[in-house]
Each structure stands twice: as structure tokens, then as C-alpha cells.
Amino acid sequence: MTTKHVLVSGIVQGVGYRAWARQEATRRNLTGWVRNCADGRVEALLEGEADAVDDMLNAMHQGPALAQVDRILVEEGNNDDDGPRSTHFEVT
């Protein structure tokens, strides 16, 4: 099991990025969350098998059709700082 904390920059709010991320993460059997940041970025915590997380990170560079991803910052995540472990992937 691996956990990644992700910040996505670009045109990623108001284009369905969070709903798309939830659908894609669920399809890959990942748990965690995704949310909008006040500065216009999207933040996510991804948990799951390493290959599935890597695949999701690759997909996040593209995003949904209306998104324009400029940059993704990925750090090793620690879910302990973000509350109890989730059993699903949610938009917060």
C-alpha cells in the first residue's frame, strides 16, 4: 500500500476535475480524497497499490477534457495527518 499527496496546478477548477478524479480513482480501487484549494489548485490524497497509484498519477497529468494541467507536485503522503483511513474515494 502506498500513499501520495498531490497538488495539481492549471485550469483544474470548474472543469469537472474532482468528479473525474473520483471516478478514475474508484476505477483503480484507490481510496482517499480530492478537494479544491483556495489558490486555484486541486489537492488529493491517493491510497492503494503502488501500480494503481502510479497509473492514477499519470492520468492526473491529462485530467478531464476541459482541464489544462500545468504542473503536478507529488509527495509521499501520510494519511495519519488527514484523519482516519477511508474505505472509498471522496470529493471533499
From Swiss-Prot:
SUPFAM superfamilies (UniProt xref): Acylphosphatase/BLUF domain-like
Reaction catalyzed: an acyl phosphate + H2O = a carboxylate + phosphate + H(+)
EC number: 3.6.1.7
Keyword set, alphabetical order: Hydrolase
Pfam families: Acylphosphatase
GO molecular function terms listed in the Swiss-Prot or TrEMBL record: acylphosphatase activity
Lineage: superkingdom: Bacteria
Domain Acylphosphatase-like: 3-92
Active site per database record: 18, 36
Protein family according to the UniProt entry: Belongs to the acylphosphatase family.
Protein name: Acylphosphatase
